[in-house]
């Protein structure tokens, strides 16, 4: 009896998914998940060659989300996504525009940035 060898594990296809964008002041993280919340692909701006102050730019966030969108389309067959944005960073709008320009249909954009109601004490003021 012959043994059949498989070349590799084929990725499951997900037509719909969720893309989480976490934009901090120093970096932007992009996480592609299925509807249940299981992570399929994750990336950040720093992983694509941007370093230092260039990581916090909208251009860098757009490039990283472009790579994440292409991976979601080619590897997982995603077509429809909903976007969840967290954080006060600058790259959120550029990241969403890059997702739409790559061919993903964005059904909803939710901003779930945590807003403190006079929570923790702020850092001391910077004296210049």
UniProtKB/Swiss-Prot annotation:
A GO cellular-component term linked to this record: ribonucleoprotein complex
Function: Located on the platform of the 30S subunit, it bridges several disparate RNA helices of the 16S rRNA. Forms part of the Shine-Dalgarno cleft in the 70S ribosome.
Quaternary assembly: Part of the 30S ribosomal subunit. Interacts with proteins S7 and S18. Binds to IF-3.
Coiled-coil parts of chain: none
Protein name per UniProt: Small ribosomal subunit protein uS11
Top-level lineage group: Bacteria
InterPro entries recorded: Ribosomal_uS11, Ribosomal_uS11_sf
Annotated S-S bridges: none
Gene Ontology molecular-function annotations: rRNA binding; structural constituent of ribosome
One Pfam family per UniProt: Ribosomal_S11
Family statement drawn from the similarity comment of this UniProt entry: Belongs to the universal ribosomal protein uS11 family.
Protein keywords: Ribonucleoprotein, Ribosomal protein, RNA-binding, rRNA-binding
UniProt record, GO biological process: translation
């Amino acid at each position: 009896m012959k043994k059949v060898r498989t070349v590799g594990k084929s990725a499951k296809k997900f037509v719909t998914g969720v893309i989480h964008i976490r934009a901090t002041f120093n970096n932007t993280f992009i996480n592609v998940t299925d509807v249940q919340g299981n992570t399929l692909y994750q990336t950040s701006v720093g992983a694509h060659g941007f370093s230092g102050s260039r990581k916090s730019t909208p251009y860098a966030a757009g490039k990283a989300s472009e790579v994440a969108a292409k991976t979601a389309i080619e590897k997982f067959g995603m077509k429809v996504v909903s976007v969840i944005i967290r954080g006060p960073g600058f790259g959120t709008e550029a990241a969403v525009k890059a997702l739409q320009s790559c061919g993903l249909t964005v059904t909803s954009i939710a901003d779930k940035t945590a807003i403190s109601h006079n929570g923790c004490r702020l850092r001391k003021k910077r004296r210049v």
